[in-house]
Amino acid sequence: GTNLWKNYSISSNIMLQSSNSGGLVSRVQGVKKYYTYEICKDNKLRIGKMNNEYKILKEIEFQVEFFKEYNLKMMLVNNKIIGYIDNKIVIDVDDFDFPFMKGGAGLGVNNGTLVTEQIILN
């Protein structure tokens, strides 16, 4: 993606194999500037923001199973970030603290392995 993308969604069927967390990244503007929507091995589902330092914007309890495929979707509408599992909204947050309004998309993993076959952008 490019740094010109604004409102879009990214989705992928992902499987964690041995990582601390993994999922989708959006509005990427470099290595230290992006949003995350991730499944965490400590049984959390999290939306976070990397702006030189990582900040959790919102997290909820979520029973995680390694080697299980999850359909994740992250939708970005202006300063609102919405997280879906299997096409159902499970978490959302508004970022009012200098929100990122544009940027690319991709996958992110923390200390381990994440498996997917495709990424869909709309």
Predicted regions and their residues:
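Carbohydrate-binding surfaces in secreted/extracellular proteins
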Residues: S12, F66-D94
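Flexible glycan-contacting loops in extracellular carbohydrate-active proteins
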Residues: V93-Q118
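Beta-strand-rich interaction surfaces with strong enrichment in secreted/lumenal proteins
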Residues: G1-N3, L24, K58-V64, D95, ...
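Extracellular beta-strand elements of beta-rich domains used
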Residues: M74, E117-L121
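Residue-level signal for tight coil/turn positions that link beta-strands
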Residues: K41-D42, N78, N111
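Secretory/extracellular carbohydrate-interaction modules
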Residues: G1-N52
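Short, aromatic/His-centered strand-loop micro-motif at the edge of beta-sheets
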Residues: N51-K73
